[in-house]
């Protein structure tokens, strides 16, 4: 399924200080954080490269269809809120952009890697996060992932929520608390949703391994595109 960006502001602030982003802003921030680690030679990012990253078919849930105009508008909102900075490099013909998540939320790379994967893919288990974040940060054990998750949960306002186990599943799931989405508490998960998560858990490991290989291909494509742009 493909999601379109909404026309609402990129971010809002709740009474408790929690910042709520729309789906487009979450995707833009996550892609900036992801590509900073995966393709540092192509970072900061141009609007064209950022749009392609937002609409990437792999390692994204949901798949989106943002235009460069959409991304430009989102960037301006995020710049105003100081989550993104515009970078004008010497000799460059286009502006480029970088995220400021480390500074805004005081995050080390392991915590940023976990949050980035959650922002890109939504609800996941610690095991799935460990597998999918390997190229952003190498976690030695699942316990290390859980420690990073706990840090994000304990922040005020929290950036991540621990969700109840779905019926028929063994692993705890985690969700990013950056949107207006309301997550169920213990005992409230609908049967249909539980069934979907159960199936997701069964195939998660294989899906993550395939996505990791696809990410490598996307990284190579981005590097090649950056090389081509030097001659344009």
From Swiss-Prot:
Xref: InterPro entries: DUF480 (IPR007432), WH-like_DNA-bd_sf (IPR036388), WH_DNA-bd_sf (IPR036390)
Signal peptide annotation: none
Record Gene3D superfamilies: Winged helix-like DNA-binding domain superfamily/Winged helix DNA-binding domain
PANTHER family for this protein: UPF0502 PROTEIN YCEH
Family: Belongs to the UPF0502 family.
Protein name according to UniProt: UPF0502 protein mma_2112
Organism: Janthinobacterium sp. (strain Marseille)
